[in-house]
């Protein structure tokens, strides 16, 4: 339903983004809204159980962030000494994380109002894949509401656990840094069992309108391309509509599927003689 470059070429999308940015500049209640998201409504439900694991959507040209732009929290398995010492002493990762903490210490030190402060202090949370499933209980609903600060899953090394063998504890700083760079520069989505997806595509005062449009098109291309499965190609039944918004703004349309337009395309194709 949405062909390649439809969004970039769409005058409606550009107008909507200009109007949205103007809203945020003029409306005092929106002055702190910086993230720009698209809301994608699909023809069919995705049929994927929500697991609270963000999936990366590669952006071809315009990065969202660099690791140094963000305050990043790393949550490790216990004990955390190996990971903390390796990452803080290695030149590739010494300034990558604002804090490194184990699950046990996280549970012990942060409760109630301290969890709220933790939420405010960090822009991004990443966790060792071996403890990621424990975090909804430890971090609480604040981090998981609206998917704004869901922890990303990373691996501390390329080591793979073999059956009946204990996994050797290793920490590879270069591999950790590569994962962080990918998380920061690209965008992501959370699979669900609904027919609606929200994806961040830009940041006010950081990305221009043409850059945001390109990021939107990259997102649509990835989510509709079946060759990108299982990470991509998750949209079923085509795209019905796309809206753009910030956290507190109204939703502005940038794409609406037109059955009449689709029928016209089919009629045009039927006139072609082979």
Curated annotation (Swiss-Prot):
<dbReference type="GO" id="GO:0030686">
    <property type="term" value="C:90S preribosome"/>
</dbReference>
<dbReference type="GO" id="GO:0042274">
    <property type="term" value="P:ribosomal small subunit biogenesis"/>
</dbReference>
<dbReference type="InterPro" id="IPR023674">
    <property type="entry name" value="Ribosomal_uL1-like"/>
</dbReference>
<dbReference type="InterPro" id="IPR050257">
    <property type="entry name" value="eL8/uL1-like"/>
</dbReference>
<keyword id="KW-0690">Ribosome biogenesis</keyword>
<protein>
    <recommendedName>
        <fullName>Ribosome biogenesis protein UTP30</fullName>
    </recommendedName>
</protein>
<dbReference type="GO" id="GO:0030490">
    <property type="term" value="P:maturation of SSU-rRNA"/>
</dbReference>
<keyword id="KW-0698">rRNA processing</keyword>
<comment type="subunit">
    <text>Component of the 90S pre-ribosomes. Interacts with FAF1.</text>
</comment>
<keyword id="KW-0539">Nucleus</keyword>
<dbReference type="GO" id="GO:0003723">
    <property type="term" value="F:RNA binding"/>
</dbReference>
<dbReference type="GO" id="GO:0032040">
    <property type="term" value="C:small-subunit processome"/>
</dbReference>
<comment type="function">
    <text>Involved in rRNA-processing and ribosome biosynthesis.</text>
</comment>
<dbReference type="GO" id="GO:0005730">
    <property type="term" value="C:nucleolus"/>
</dbReference>
<dbReference type="GO" id="GO:0005634">
    <property type="term" value="C:nucleus"/>
</dbReference>
<comment type="similarity">
    <text>Belongs to the universal ribosomal protein uL1 family. Highly divergent.</text>
</comment>
<dbReference type="InterPro" id="IPR028364">
    <property type="entry name" value="Ribosomal_uL1/biogenesis"/>
</dbReference>
<dbReference type="GO" id="GO:0000462">
    <property type="term" value="P:maturation of SSU-rRNA from tricistronic rRNA transcript (SSU-rRNA, 5.8S rRNA, LSU-rRNA)"/>
</dbReference>
<dbReference type="Pfam" id="PF00687">
    <property type="entry name" value="Ribosomal_L1"/>
</dbReference>
């Amino acid at each position: 339903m949405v062909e390649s470059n439809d969004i970039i070429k769409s005058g409606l999308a550009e107008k909507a983004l200009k109007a949205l940015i103007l809203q945020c500049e003029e409306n005092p209640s929106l002055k702190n809204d910086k993230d720009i998201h698209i809301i994608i409504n699909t023809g069919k439900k995705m049929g994927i159980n929500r697991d609270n694991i963000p999936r990366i959507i590669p952006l071809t040209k315009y990065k969202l962030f660099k690791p140094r732009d963000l305050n990043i929290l790393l949550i490790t398995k216990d004990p955390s000494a190996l990971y903390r010492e390796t990452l803080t002493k290695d030149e590739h990762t010494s300034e990558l994380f604002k804090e490194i903490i184990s699950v046990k210490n996280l549970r012990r030190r942060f409760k109630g109002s301290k969890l709220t402060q933790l939420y405010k202090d960090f822009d991004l949370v990443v966790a060792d894949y071996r403890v990621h499933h424990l975090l909804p209980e430890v971090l609480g609903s604040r981090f998981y509401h609206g998917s704004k600060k869901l922890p990303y899953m990373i691996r501390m090394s390329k080591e793979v656990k073999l059956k009946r063998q204990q996994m050797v504890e290793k920490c590879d700083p270069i591999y950790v840094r590569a994962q962080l760079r990918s998380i920061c520069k690209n965008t992501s989505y959370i699979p669900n069992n609904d027919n609606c997806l929200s994806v961040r595509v830009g940041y006010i005062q950081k990305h221009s309108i043409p850059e945001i449009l390109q990021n939107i098109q990259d997102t649509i291309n990835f989510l509709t391309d079946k060759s990108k499965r299982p990470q991509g190609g998750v949209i079923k039944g085509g795209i019905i509509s796309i809206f753009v918004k910030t956290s507190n703004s109204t939703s502005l349309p940038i794409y609406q599927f037109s059955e009449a337009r689709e029928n016209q395309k089919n009629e045009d194709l039927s006139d072609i003689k082979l």
